[in-house]
Design a protein with these regions (language model features):
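A short SAM/SAH-binding and catalytic strip from SAM-dependent methyltransferases
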Residues: 113-124
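Class I SAM-dependent methyltransferase SAM/SAH-binding core
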Residues: 48, 54-103
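A short acidic, Gly/Pro-enriched loop at the edge of an enzyme's catalytic core
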Residues: 102-113
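Conserved class I S-adenosyl-L-methionine
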Residues: 1-43, 87-88
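A short glycine-rich, Lys/Arg-flanked "PGG" loop and its adjoining helix->strand segment in the class I
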Residues: 127-139
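Short N-terminal helix/helix-N-cap motif within the alpha/beta-hydrolase-1
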Residues: 124-128, 153
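A short hydrophobic/small-residue beta-strand
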Residues: 68, 143-144
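C-terminal alpha-helical "lid/dimerization" subdomain adjacent to the S-adenosyl-L-methionine
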Residues: 2, 12, 18-26, 144-201
Length: 206
């Protein structure tokens, strides 16, 4: 996929403008992403980011020094993510693919760590997605689910409104994910920041 220098610069400028806009509403993107990574530690092995989006968490994970896989259903969204990585020279750390979270093309037990950040609220079937995560998780691996808190969603709604858009929500919640993991016998550890609700789930103590 060829990118021009102008594309890199323009995309990065849009990224900085969005970070600044979030900051105006009290949402520190970099701080929230760092919170998720720190609460997920320690982790290593085969790492998956489920739901690339525009790549805000992708960038944070790459900047933290990790090599990982990332999939999304949208090639257009992944292009934004790749442009941002290329701006910082981090594109070699991420292997992108297109996939549906309800039918992930991956062997059973392949991933040691699975991140799903700010994705659950876009899902209509959290149970199906979580069961897919469990299927592709290694026996000693862990799944990290993080999504906007009530306060975070309120901020995101305001930001979308400022941009003349509407933040589309499906029915998925982090509590639904927690219920599935408990039913499957997983151990759960929970964390919360002002803007994020987060859980870490694993078959062994997490």
């Amino acid at each position: 996929m060829k990118m021009t220098e102008n594309e890199l610069i323009e995309n990065h400028q849009r990224y900085l403008e969005r970070v600044a806009l979030y900051g105006e509403f009290g949402y520190d993107i970099e701080k929230e992403r760092s919170f998720i990574i720190e609460k997920a530690r320690p982790f290593s092995g085969n790492i998956l980011e489920a739901g690339t989006g525009k790549g805000y968490f992708t960038l944070a994970l790459a900047e933290a020094g990790f090599n990982f896989f990332s999939f999304d259903i949208s090639a257009a969204e992944q292009r934004y993510a790749l442009l941002n990585l290329m701006y910082y020279g981090l594109q070699q750390q991420v292997t992108f693919s297109l996939a549906d979270v309800e039918n992930i093309p991956c062997d059973d037990g392949f991933f040691d760590v699975i991140f799903a950040v700010n994705m659950i609220h876009h899902l209509s079937s959290v149970r199906t997605a979580c069961n897919e995560f469990i299927r592709i998780l290694s026996p000693s691996g862990k799944i990290i689910i993080s999504d906007f808190s009530t306060e975070g969603l309120a901020v995101i709604d305001k930001i979308h409104e400022c941009e003349g858009r509407k933040h589309e929500l499906m029915s998925g919640t982090i509590n639904e994910a927690k219920k599935v993991f408990i039913e499957r016998g997983f151990n759960i550890r929970e964390h919360k920041s002002i803007m994020q609700d987060m859980l870490v789930a694993g078959r062994i103590a997490v």
